[in-house]
C-alpha cells in the first residue's frame, strides 16, 4: 500500500518572465523569453552580460509599505510565498501556526540592506514571521538543486506528521560576486543561452517560487483544489567533482530512479521531463546520458525541455521555478519549449524545440543538478482521488559511530579524555597537522572546513566499525549541516573579486556554495546515496539528524552519515573561559569544529554486529522569534517524553538566552542534570549542536559528561542541578539534547540507552 498522498494546492512565482503564475505560464506558452542584457552598469566589466532579471517595478507593486525595508532576497521570497498561500485559499483557521512548516532552498548567502552577509536562514525567518508560521523550518542549501530538494523534504514533514501544511520553495537574487564566479569559470554565454543545442554557456537569473503542500485528504476536507501530487522524490550524490557533473550521468540517473521508486512508478509512466538544461556543454551532454540510461530505447520519445532558456539559471530557486512549470504543464496538458534551440543540431532526443506542445501529460519528472554533486528528481502527477494508505513506518534508529574534531582533540577517545579531565579549548582551532584523511592530490587543495569534515567522517566510520562493499556505498546517505560554510573560501573569493572581478579565485568560488563540503565528503568516501545540506545556524545538526532518521524510516537508506562543521569568523582571546548558565561568567566565544555521527537502522547495526551508543527516541523542532524563546523550547519538547531524562545537554553558549533555557529545562525536566559542550569548545555553531549530540551519546554509553567548571551562581535552580563532575554518579537511561538558532529554530533530540 502506498504512503499518504501529498498534493500541491498553491503556486507562487516571480522571475524574469512573470510576476505571478498566470503571467509566467503565458510567457512560457508564447515562447517569449526574459533573458536580456544586464541593466546594472557594474556588470559592464564582463564580456558576457545577459541574465534573467526581475524588474524592480514588479517587486514594488506587490509589497506593502511594511516590507519596503526588507532586502531584495526576502522581498522576492515573500511575494512568491504569499501567492502560493493565496491560491491555496489557506486561512489562519485552516492550519495551526505550530503545524505550518517552511522548507526554503537557497544557493547563496545574500546581503542585507546594508550589504552585510545575513545568516542563510534569515530569508526563511522573514517569510515565516510575516505569514505566521511556527512549525518545522528548514533552510536547505544544495546549491542549484535546493529548490527541488525543498519540495521533497516538505513532503517528508507531512508524512512523518510533524506538519499539516508545508510551504516549499527557493529563492536567489542576481549577485555581482556570483556572476563574477561563473564568468571566471567561463561558464556564461555571451547571448541568450541555448540548452541542448548550441550549449555554449548559461545565463544567470533571479527569482523565487513556492509550492504549498498538504495531505490530499486534508486538502479535500477544507475544499481546496489539488493541482498536482508529489508522488515521489529522489536525492543522490555524484561523488565526482566540486563543480563538474559526473559525465557518465550515474548520479542524475540514480536520482530519477529513486524518485520513481518512491512513487511506485516505472519509466513507462513518465510523460514529460523538465530538464535542468543549463546550456553548458558538460551539463547538457550529461543530461542526454541520464535520459538514455533511465529510459533506454524509449528516451527519444520522452519530451524534455529546459525553461532556463526563458529565465536563466535562478540557482537556489531553479528547482522550485521548474516545479511550478511542471505543475502547470500537468494542469494544461502542454509541454513548455526549449527556446533558442538550433534545429540544425544533431540529436536523437526530443527537446521540444522552440514551440510549446499540446500533449497528454500524466506524470512529470523534474530534474536538478548542482555544484558539489547534488542531484534531485521530483515525480509529479495528476492528482488522484482519496485512497487508503499506510502510516509512515516506525523503524528503530541508533547512533553507532562518533567522529569529533575540535580543539579538544581528534576522535572519540581524545574527546572522552578531555571531558574526563575537564580540559578547555575555547578558541583553539582543531589541528590536523601531519594527518591526511583523503588522497593527497585532493587533500592539499582542500580548505580547512572540508578537511575537518572529512576527518570527522572517517573517524565516525572507523568508530562504528562499519565495513561495506563498494556497491553498498551507493545507498549510504550523507547530510551535511553548517551555519556558514567555509569562511576561508568565502573570504578568499570576495577579496579576489574586489581586486579584479574578471580574475576571481575560481577554486575558492567552487567552495563558496555551502554544500561543497558535503560534496567533498561524498567524493572522498565514495558515498552516492541520498544527500542534502542543512543551513539553519546552530540548529542545523539536530535538523540534519531528523532528516537522517526520516531517510532510514522511509527505507531510503540503512546508513546515513550526519556531518556538522563550522569555523569561527573571529578568534577568541587566548585563555578565554566561559561558563554557560552562570550569571557572573557570561560571554560568548567562537570556536571551530566538525563532528560526524553515524546513524543506522537498529536492525542493520545488529546484523553487522555493531555496538551502538544510543537509540534515537524522538526529535522535535519549532520555529521561533527572538521574543519567543521560552515558549519555543516548550513547543520543541511538546511531542517528546523527556521529563524522565537523567541528563540534559543544552544549547547554552554563555549568551543572553541561557537564562531562558535553564529556567524552562529545569522546570520541564526536573531530574535531569544540565550541561553543555560549549563551555569546553566555544560556540562552534552547527558543530556545537552535533557535539552536544555526541557527548549525550557518550554519556549514555560511558557515563561521562562535560562538567560546568566555575558554576557558582546559576540563572535558575541550584548548582546541584548542573553537571559539576565529569564522571556521572548514576547511569543515564535517557538524555535530552537541545539546539538553538536564535530567532529561527529551536530543536530537541531525545536519546535512550540500548536495551
Question: What feature does the model see in each segment?
Answer:
Residues 1-4, 36-79, 106-153, 162, ...:
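Conserved catalytic cysteine-centered active-site region
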Residues 1-67, 88, 106, 217-229, ...:
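ACP-dependent fatty acid/polyketide chain-elongation machinery
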Residues 1-8, 92-97, 265-269, 295-300, ...:
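Flexible, low-complexity linker/loop segments at domain and module junctions
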Residues 8-10, 28, 81, 102, ...:
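Conserved small-residue
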Residues 37, 152, 156, 160, ...:
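Glycine-/small-residue-rich "gating" segment that lines the acyl/pantetheine channel
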Residues 5-9, 32-37, 192-263, 272, ...:
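Condensing-enzyme catalytic core mediating Claisen C-C bond formation in acyl metabolism
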Residues 77-89, 123-124, 131, 138-170, ...:
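Active-site-proximal alpha-helical scaffold in enzymes
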Residues 162-184, 189-200, 233-247, 272-285, ...:
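Acyl-CoA/ACP chain-elongation machinery
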Amino acid at each position: 500500500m502506498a504512503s499518504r498522498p501529498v498534493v500541491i494546492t498553491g503556486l507562487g512565482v516571480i522571475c524574469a518572465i512573470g510576476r505571478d503564475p498566470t503571467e509566467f505560464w503565458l510567457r512560457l506558452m508564447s515562447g517569449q523569453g526574459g533573458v536580456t542584457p544586464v541593466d546594472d552598469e557594474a556588470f559592464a566589466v564582463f564580456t558576457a552580460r545577459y541574465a534573467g532579471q526581475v524588474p524592480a517595478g514588479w517587486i514594488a507593486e506587490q509589497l506593502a509599505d511594511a516590507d519596503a525595508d526588507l532586502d531584495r532576497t526576502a522581498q522576492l521570497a515573500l511575494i512568491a510565498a504569499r501567492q502560493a498561500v493565496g491560491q491555496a485559499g489557506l486561512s489562519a483557521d485552516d492550519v495551526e501556526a505550530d503545524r505550518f512548516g517552511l522548507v526554503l532552498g537557497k544557493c547563496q548567502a545574500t546581503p542585507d540592506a546594508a550589504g552585510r552577509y545575513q545568516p542563510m536562514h534569515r530569508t526563511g525567518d522573514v517569510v515565516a514571521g510575516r505569514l505566521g508560521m511556527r512549525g518545522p523550518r528548514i533552510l536547505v542549501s544544495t546549491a542549484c538543486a535546493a529548490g527541488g530538494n525543498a519540495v521533497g523534504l516538505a513532503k517528508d514533514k507531512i508524512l512523518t506528521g510533524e506538519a499539516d501544511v508545508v510551504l516549499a520553495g527557493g529563492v536567489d537574487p542576481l549577485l555581482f560576486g556570483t556572476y563574477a564566479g561563473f564568468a571566471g569559470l567561463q561558464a556564461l554565454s555571451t547571448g541568450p543561452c541555448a540548452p541542448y543545442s548550441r550549449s555554449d554557456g548559461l545565463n544567470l537569473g533571479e527569482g523565487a517560487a513556492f509550492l504549498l503542500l498538504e495531505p490530499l485528504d486534508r486538502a479535500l476536507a477544507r475544499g481546496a483544489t489539488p493541482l498536482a501530487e508529489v508522488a515521489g522524490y529522489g536525492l543522490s550524490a555524484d561523488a565526482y567533482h566540486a563543480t563538474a557533473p559526473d559525465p557518465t550521468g550515474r548520479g542524475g540517473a540514480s536520482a530519477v530512479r529513486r524518485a520513481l521508486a518512491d512513487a511506485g512508478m516505472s519509466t513507462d509512466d513518465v510523460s514529460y521531463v523538465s530538464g535542468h538544461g543549463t546550456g553548458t556543454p558538460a551539463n547538457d551532454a550529461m543530461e542526454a546520458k541520464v535520459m538514455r540510461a533511465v529510459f533506454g530505447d524509449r528516451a527519444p520519445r520522452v519530451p524534455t525541455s529546459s525553461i532556463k532558456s526563458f529565465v536563466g539559471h535562478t540557482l537556489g530557486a531553479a528547482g522550485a521555478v521548474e516545479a511550478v512549470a511542471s505543475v502547470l504543464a500537468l494542469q494544461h496538458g502542454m509541454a513548455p519549449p526549449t527556446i533558442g534551440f538550433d534545429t540544425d543540431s544533431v540529436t536523437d532526443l526530443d527537446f521540444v524545440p522552440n514551440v510549446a506542445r499540446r500533449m497528454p501529460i500524466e506524470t512529470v519528472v523534474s530534474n536538478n543538478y548542482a555544484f558539489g554533486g547534488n542531484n534531485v528528481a521530483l515525480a509529479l502527477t495528476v492528482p488522484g482521488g482519496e485512497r487508503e494508505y499506510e502510516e509512515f513506518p516506525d523503524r528503530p534508529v541508533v547512533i553507532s559511530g562518533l567522529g569529533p574534531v575540535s580543539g579538544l582533540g581528534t576522535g572519540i577517545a581524545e574527546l572522552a579524555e578531555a571531558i574526563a579531565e575537564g580540559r578547555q579549548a575555547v578558541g583553539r582551532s582543531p589541528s590536523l597537522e601531519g594527518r591526511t584523511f583523503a588522497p593527497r592530490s585532493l587533500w592539499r587543495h582542500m580548505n580547512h572546513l572540508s578537511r575537518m569534515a572529512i576527518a570527522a567522517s572517517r573517524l565516525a566510520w572507523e568508530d562504528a566499525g562499519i565495513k561495506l562493499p563498494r556497491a553498498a556505498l551507493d545507498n549510504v546517505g550523507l547530510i551535511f549541516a553548517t551555519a556558514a560554510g567555509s569562511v576561508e573560501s568565502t573570504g578568499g573569493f570576495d577579496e579576489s573579486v574586489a581586486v579584479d572581478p574578471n580574475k576571481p579565485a575560481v577554486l575558492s568560488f567552487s567552495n563558496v556554495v555551502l554544500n561543497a563540503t558535503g560534496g567533498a565528503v561524498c567524493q572522498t568516501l565514495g558515498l552516492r546515496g541520498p544527500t542534502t545540506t542543512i543551513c539553519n545556524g546552530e540548529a542545523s545538526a539536530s535538523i540534519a539528524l531528523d532528516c537522517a532518521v526520516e531517510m532510514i524510516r522511509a527505507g531510503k537508506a540503512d546508513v546515513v552519515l550526519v556531518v556538522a562543521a563550522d569555523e569561527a569568523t573571529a578568534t577568541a582571546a587566548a585563555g578565554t573561559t566561559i561558563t554557560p548558565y552562570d550569571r557572573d561568567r557570561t560571554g560568548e566565544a567562537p570556536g571551530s569544529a566538525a563532528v560526524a555521527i553515524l546513524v543506522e537502522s537498529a536492525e542493520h547495526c545488529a546484523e553487522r554486529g555493531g555496538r551502538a551508543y544510543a537509540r534515537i527516541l524522538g526529535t522535535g523542532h519549532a520555529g521561533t522569534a527572538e521574543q519567543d524563546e521560552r515558549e519555543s523550547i516548550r513547543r520543541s519538547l511538546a511531542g517528546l517524553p523527556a521529563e524522565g531524562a537523567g541528563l540534559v545537554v543544552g544549547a547554552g553558549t554563555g549568551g543572553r538566552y541561557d537564562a531562558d533555557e535553564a529556567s524552562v529545562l529545569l522546570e520541564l525536566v526536573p531530574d535531569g542534570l544540565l550541561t553543555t559542550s560549549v563551555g569546553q569548545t566555544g560556540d562552534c555553531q552547527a558543530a556545537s549542536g552535533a557535539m552536544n549530540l555526541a557527548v549525550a551519546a557518550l554519556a549514555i554509553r560511558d557515563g561521562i559528561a562535560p562538567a560546568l567548571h566555575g558554576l557558582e551562581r546559576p540563572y535558575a535552580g541550584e548548582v546541584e542541578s548542573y553537571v559539576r563532575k565529569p564522571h556521572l554518579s548514576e547511569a543515564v537511561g535517557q538524555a535530552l539534547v537541545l539546539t538553538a538558532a536564535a530567532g529561527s529554530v529551536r530543536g530537541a533530540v531525545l536519546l535512550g540507552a540500548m536495551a
